[in-house]
């Protein structure tokens, strides 16, 4: 067994750069059941931006907006729209993580530094990954505060209701044609990840378009990053649409785990979150395809939840429509009942569903 030179304890937080963090924070609190726990902005001594930290179980989302027109974050928003900037990784030693990765070829975004306040200190360091996305290593073993130094505790202005979201299962990146293997190699060689699964254009294709995907995972399996690229097809694939509207590579979706997907999706739908729809015929022979499952078929059909089985068990999953006007970032809700895979049996149904949405937008 080779030593894991980059031990990661899990996802620390995901930061989105957005046009209006105050309004985005309200959306994620109301619709997704997150709770506001901390804030940084002019009132806390941060003059150039406002950041809201939202939490549910083990998930932390940070929503950040710039406060001036010439702020660098504005250039990011102008190019990409609202999108994921930081996939932060919780580590025991930020400096070692940064040294190990930069010595293997990672591009440094920020050298190790210490953030301090009355609750202790946090060490952070950042490297570049695909597009304008970065990984920040966060070492918080000497910190007792709510989030990071510079943030103050802040509570939601209304009573939020959790909907059963537990932790981030995986985060998916979209890269340009011919770039997937480059980034898989980056994660393998620079970050010590292992290739978990490969899907080619025969696995993920429709009459019109196709994509290819490889999944990399860190040593303990807590961090999983599928990476997609478009494949040759008759028409524009969903990955090409994303790349066009995002203005380059970036995070396509964040998959969040629940232990009761029927409850979670029921709540999301009640609060106005829109999901991709599959035809009702998907359910006609579902049990023949996946075998016995614990759930009743009727609520799955009503909520449009998909099911797939692998050697280890089965999973239930559903995908939101994009959560902003550009057809870019969306969320997946997933419940694993033993399955360790990613729903290969649903790829075709999902892809066709996305193409129907693309058609409506005039982008197919």
Protein language model regions, located:
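N-terminal beta-strand motif that seeds the catalytic metal site of vicinal oxygen chelate
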Residues: 1-22, 84-87, 144-184, 247-256, ...
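Active-site-adjacent "gating/activation" loops or surface patches in catalytic cores
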Residues: 220-241
């Amino acid at each position: 067994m080779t030593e894991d030179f980059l031990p990661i304890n899990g996802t620390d937080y995901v930061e989105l750069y957005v046009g209006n963090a105050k309004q985005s924070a309200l959306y994620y609190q109301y619709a997704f059941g997150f709770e506001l726990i901390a804030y940084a902005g002019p009132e806390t001594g941060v003059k150039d931006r406002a950041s809201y930290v939202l939490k549910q179980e083990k998930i932390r989302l940070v929503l950040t907006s710039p406060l001036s027109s010439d702020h660098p974050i504005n250039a990011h928003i102008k190019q990409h729209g609202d999108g994921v900037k930081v996939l932060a990784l919780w580590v025991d030693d930020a400096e070692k993580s940064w040294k190990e990765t930069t010595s293997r070829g990672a591009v440094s975004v920020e050298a190790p530094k210490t953030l301090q306040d009355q609750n202790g200190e946090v060490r952070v360091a950042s490297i570049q990954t695909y597009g304008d996305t970065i990984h920040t290593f966060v070492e918080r073993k000497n910190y007792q505060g709510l989030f990071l130094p510079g943030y103050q505790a802040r509570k939601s202005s209304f009573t939020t209701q959790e909907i059963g979201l537990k932790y981030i299962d995986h985060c998916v990146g979209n890269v340009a044609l011919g770039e997937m293997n480059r980034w898989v190699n980056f994660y393998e060689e620079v970050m010590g990840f292992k290739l978990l699964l490969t899907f080619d254009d025969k696995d993920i294709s429709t009459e019109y378009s196709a994509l290819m995907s490889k999944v990399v995972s860190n040593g303990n399996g807590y961090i999983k990053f599928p990476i997609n690229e478009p494949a040759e097809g008759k028409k524009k694939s969903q990955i090409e649409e994303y790349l066009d509207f995002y203005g380059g590579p970036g995070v396509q979706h964040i998959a969040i785990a629940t232990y009761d997907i029927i409850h979670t999706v029921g709540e999301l739908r009640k609060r106005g979150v829109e999901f991709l729809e599959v035809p009702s015929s998907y359910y006609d022979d579902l049990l023949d395809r996946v075998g016995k499952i614990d759930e009743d078929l009727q609520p799955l059909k009503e909520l449009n939840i998909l099911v797939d089985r692998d050697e280890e068990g089965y999973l239930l999953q559903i995908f939101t429509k994009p959560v902003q006007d550009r057809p870019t970032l969306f969320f997946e809700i997933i419940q694993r009942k033993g399955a360790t895979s990613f729903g290969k049996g649903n790829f075709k149904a999902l892809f066709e569903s996305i193409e129907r949405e693309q058609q409506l937008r005039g982008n197919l």
